[in-house]
């Protein structure tokens, strides 16, 4: 990796960290903000958050697909500008509908940035560097989510608007970093006069369909597991013990990701991805079974969370590698945008968990999640066996 590429990559990783800190400082407090500022009831807040998140995901798909037609550096700058503008606008308006729309803009912009960031890495990094850098980026995201919420807690105690201003300030530095140090994507420069680009390709690629469905199921299991666990513990015990469990599970998850993500991710390659993704699935299942038997033992909750997190550590770079392998060179951002639809699985997890916990024995929740992650693994294998674009199967 030459000096220019190293600077560009470092600038993008730092930008990813700062934007995630800003998002982490605000997203957990949106319910408090809507309650205090607009006196919304709990159910209305739930509807508002769901609408905003759904709009953000849907529009980010379209904008992410369009990113393949433009310079990715400029596209990331536009996404960050929209991200910062949304936070500033929320503090200036006095209308709940506008707040929801601006929150949707924030989520859309963040998703677009994350998608184009992956595409930039795919365009410019060597095959041996991609999973290493993506693992580092995933570590940055977890560090951001570790730092952001405590900062937001401190600021919201002073003023309900301060977390939003922090997020806007955090956005200013990435704009500077990207403008100065990030080079234009070599793929865009080489193909902007005659690239072959068609969104219809997304609908015709069976491997992408299998991988997206697999990602949806995997994110349903792992994307909101902390809230899922807290719902479960509140049913079998009480709110106080649920807080203790979450206080154990989240630090264990963050510590495992920060310390192991790079060392595990850098070992992923086309030759061993099937075996490692199978091992990751097994870790998910063992962790979920461990949750069933953890009961009132915080030690068992922590140990089960550690095993569960190993599955997450393997799946994150593995899913990136799978999509990168099947995406045509001119459509990297489009493919990563389609993959991002899988995160809708995490969005519906709290709703489904609530239904399961109120209609079935509590332990059945983790049995269902174990079956879901096994289904995700089966769909992933179907995608691996597909042969897109005349390529050989991945492994």
Curated annotation (Swiss-Prot):
The chain crosses the membrane at residues 12-34, 44-66, 75-94, 99-121, 134-156, 160-182, 208-230, 245-264, 271-293, 298-320, 341-360, 364-381. The keyword Membrane applies. Keywords: Cell inner membrane, Cell membrane, Membrane, Peptide transport, Protein transport, Transmembrane, Transmembrane helix, Transport. Belongs to the major facilitator superfamily. PANTHER family: MFS FAMILY TRANSPORT PROTEIN, SUGAR EFFLUX TRANSPORTER A-RELATED. GO terms for cellular component: plasma membrane. One of its GO terms (molecular function) is dipeptide transmembrane transporter activity. A transporter able to export peptides. When overexpressed, allows cells deleted for multiple peptidases (pepA, pepB, pepD and pepN) to grow in the presence of dipeptides Ala-Gln or Gly-Tyr which otherwise inhibit growth. Cells overexpressing this protein have decreased intracellular levels of Ala-Gln dipeptide, and in a system that produces the Ala-Gln dipeptide overproduction of this protein increases export of the dipeptide. It is a multi-pass membrane protein. It is found in: Cell inner membrane. Pfam families: MFS_1. This is Uncharacterized MFS-type transporter YdeE. Gene3D superfamilies: MFS general substrate transporter like domains. The gene is ydeE. The lineage of its organism: Bacteria, Pseudomonadati, Pseudomonadota, Gammaproteobacteria, Enterobacterales. GO terms for biological process: dipeptide transmembrane transport; protein transport.
